[in-house]
Amino acid sequence: MASNLPQERNHEACLLIRDLDPMVTESLLMELFIQAAPVVKVFIPKDKLTQQHSGRAYVEFQSSSDAEYALKVMKFVRLFNKEIKIKKENKDKVDIGANLFIGNLDADVDERILHDTFSRFGTIIFTPKVMRDENGVSKGFAFINFDSFEASDAAIEAMNSQFLCNKPISVTYARKKDSNERHGSSAERIIAASRNTGYLNQQQQQQSSSTSSTSTISTSTPQQQQQQQSQPLPPPIVTAGGIIHQQQIQQQQQLQQQQQQQLQLQQLQLQQLQQQQQQQQQQQQQQQQQQQQQQQQQQQQQHHPHHQHPIPHPHPLPHQLRPHPHPHHPPPPPFNPMLMQFNPMMMPFGGMPPPPPHK
């Protein structure tokens, strides 16, 4: 899996992260480790068929000092309620480990059965892996990795040729990736023992340094305490799984703001569309009213044709005392005083008025 890494990376500035949860992604590791130091790249080896990682990742920094600082700061960090293991990558790494090959497995044997069966011999580093085909059917063999050769030797002696789910299994050391040699050789055991002693010495040094640092902190001056408080702290840890930091919060806030802006724009567009539709409806109504008025006028003109003038001509102004004759309206009859009726009641009392006196 590690052979898929690009060879031009800086091994001195690279960290190896193990025991990762399947939910961990490269972007999440980038956001986590960039809080400690500038990150060049993050690589998680994945299986070609399943596209799932085995819990390992590589994080490359700009310099070895950045990698060492991130190694100190990111210890005891938990991702998805699972503590991760971090260490420096070794360029001259050799495929060393108490890795076992279990063959002739029954189809009913799964990872849980293997773990429950072999965990009594020692600590299992990784979850036992049963090899399966594309349909999820077991191929009949699996791999188990112990933390020591004593545990793997005990497992071989106790479980080789033993029945597991109605089939006798074969337990041997697995072959190495780059050669046909098997694990468990004397040279490999010597190298593993030297590494274990070196790891124990490192742990003792770390414990002694931690105790000395606690004593110095208790006797430090206020100025030293202020300097220590000004140093960057590790990111906050959430025990329920996952890490919350400022970058994620800012990204979420930015996304929420963008969504709100998009909603506001959509609402404005909807309002504009509604206004345009209302204006169009009003224009259509006005046009319909005008058409109706025109139709009514046409109907009235058809019912009263004598009011229409075939030849337009100006109407003369009427006379003050009598109307001017009009070609369409006959003039009134002439005045005839004989036709007037005498009404004595209209006269004053006593008959006719007396004549005026002579002067």
From Swiss-Prot:
Q: Name one GO cellular component term.
A: U2 snRNP
**Does the keyword section mention Cell cycle?**
no
Keywords noted in UniProt: mRNA processing, mRNA splicing, Nucleus, Repeat, RNA-binding, Spliceosome
- Name all RRM domain ranges: 13-91, 98-176
Q: Where in the sequence does UniProt note compositional bias of the Low complexity kind?
A: 202-231, 293-302
What are the boundaries of the region Disordered? 198-239, 293-337
- Annotated membrane-spanning segments are none
> What SUPFAM superfamilies has UniProt attached to this entry?
RNA-binding domain, RBD (SSF54928)
Residue spans of biased composition, Basic residues class? 303-312
Gene Ontology biological process terms in this record: mRNA splicing, via spliceosome
**What Gene Ontology molecular function terms does this protein carry?**
RNA binding
Protein's UniProt keywords contain Repeat: yes
Where, subcellularly, is it found?
Nucleus
Quaternary structure (record): Component of splicing factor SF3B which is composed of at least eight subunits.
Role this protein plays: Subunit of the splicing factor SF3B required for 'A' complex assembly formed by the stable binding of U2 snRNP to the branchpoint sequence (BPS) in pre-mRNA. Sequence independent binding of SF3A/SF3B complex upstream of the branch site is essential, it may anchor U2 snRNP to the pre-mRNA. May also be involved in the assembly of the 'E' complex. Has been found in complex 'B' and 'C' as well.
What is the recorded name of this protein?
Splicing factor 3B subunit 4
The species this protein was found in: Dictyostelium discoideum
